[in-house]
Design a protein with these regions (language model features):
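Glycan-recognition and catalytic cores of secretory/periplasmic carbohydrate-active enzymes
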Residues: 1-212
Length: 212
């Protein structure tokens, strides 16, 4: 897939971003699963999934941020949302194909995501530890949707527990009635407001996405 297109649909850059590659695999899989059983949609989904399976990670399902056209890694797997979109892609693709390998990739990647919740960037975290430790809204926001996306691969009890945790984080930690009902993007590790740039940040798109 190429995702860097101008207004006429012409490719202006051939680098490949795992966020967008994963979204396209998910999209073609979802269209096949829920709209119409069109073979060309399934073929597109499988083609993208096979590219990601071969080139998108380091061999241990640590998903790179970007690749060149041929699949050589450009940016290391520092970004946890590469993992989330890979999980969504292979979860939906497993439904479309019945392929157990795709299901296993989705489950393994989801497990890695959960192991990284306390430090999503891992060894690529550039922040100095201990000075201003913050909890970010983006991960619990997307985990709720992610768990529903791979519901067919999760134990029902585990799914319910994950959903309850995410809803608590969204509604009891980041949603702030005392600020007029806005959702802040960052709080401290105890859930308190922080008077700094990051603590004052609001991302309306994330709030809408979480409520959806």
């Amino acid at each position: 897939y190429f995702s860097c297109l101008d207004r006429e649909g012409k490719v202006f850059d051939t680098d490949k971003f795992i966020w967008l590659q994963g979204r396209e695999v998910w999209m073609f899989s979802m269209l096949y699963n829920k709209v119409e059983k069109r073979q060309e949609w399934l073929d597109c989904a499988v083609q993208g999934g096979e590219f990601l399976k071969k080139y998108g990670h380091d061999g241990n399902y640590n998903w790179y941020f970007s690749l060149d056209r041929s699949g050589r890694p450009l940016v290391e797997p520092y970004n946890i949302f590469s993992y989330t979109f890979a999980t969504m892609a292979f979860g939906q693709l497993s439904l479309a194909t019945g392929n157990q390998e795709y299901a296993d990739i989705a489950k393994k990647t989801f497990e890695i995501i959960l192991s990284k919740v306390s430090n999503p960037k891992g060894k690529w975290n550039k922040l100095h530890p201990g000075t201003r430790n913050l909890k970010n809204f983006a991960l619990p926001m997307i985990l709720c949707n992610l768990a529903l996306e791979i519901e067919h691969l999760l134990d029902p009890g585990y799914l319910e527990q994950t959903m309850e945790t995410c809803i608590h984080e969204v509604m009891d930690v980041f949603y702030r009635p005392e600020l007029g009902g806005i959702i802040v993007e960052n709080v401290d590790m105890d859930g308190n407001l922080v008077d700094c740039f990051e603590g004052r940040q609001v991302t309306p798109g994330h709030a809408i996405e979480a409520m959806w």
